[in-house]
């Protein structure tokens, strides 16, 4: 796995710090971590940072944020073909099956319920980026 460029989108600074720390402690080769407090800020970062030769490798996004929520963010992100292939992992407390299905239809690749364990984040990242998880490959 190459050095990763990751974007964390959450209105909670504490949650952004938690995800950042978890990714770093998971022994993943992180090169850059960008942070945004809502979907509008995230799109600005994506439009600036997700360009050749330094594309983003993964986006973590919350659902319930001010200005632009996570669902709107994923939808807007997928409208630009240059950003259509960046994996998006949703981390949120809003875990209804209907909502998860809608997010997958919009283009999110995974979902983790808050509060989330560091091991769950690591396993999901490995799955999304094509690494063989060290635990079972059950659907998370």
Which ranges hold each PLM region?
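Receiver (REC) domain active-site loop signature in two-component systems and cognate sites
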Residues: 65
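A Lys-centered signature of the CheY-like receiver
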Residues: 11, 114
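Active-site residues of response regulator receiver
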Residues: 62, 92
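Acidic, metal-coordinating helix/loop segments flanking the phosphotransfer/catalytic sites
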Residues: 35-58
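C-terminal output helix
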Residues: 116-125
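Two-component/phosphorelay signaling modules centered on CheY-like receiver
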Residues: 13-34
């Amino acid at each position: 796995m190459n050095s990763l460029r990751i974007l964390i989108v959450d209105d909670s600074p504490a949650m952004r710090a938690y995800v950042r720390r978890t990714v770093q402690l998971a022994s993943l080769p992180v090169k850059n971590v960008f942070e945004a407090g809502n979907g509008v800020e995230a799109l600005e970062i994506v439009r600036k940072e997700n360009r050749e030769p330094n594309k983003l490798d993964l986006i973590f996004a919350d659902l319930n944020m001010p200005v632009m929520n996570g669902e709107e963010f994923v939808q807007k992100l997928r409208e630009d073909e240059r950003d259509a292939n960046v994996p998006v992992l949703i981390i949120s407390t809003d875990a209804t099956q209907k909502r998860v299905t809608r997010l997958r239809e919009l283009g999110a690749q995974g979902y983790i319920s808050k509060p989330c364990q560091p091991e769950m984040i690591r396993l999901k990242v490995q799955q999304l980026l094509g690494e063989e998880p060290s635990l079972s490959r059950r659907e998370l």
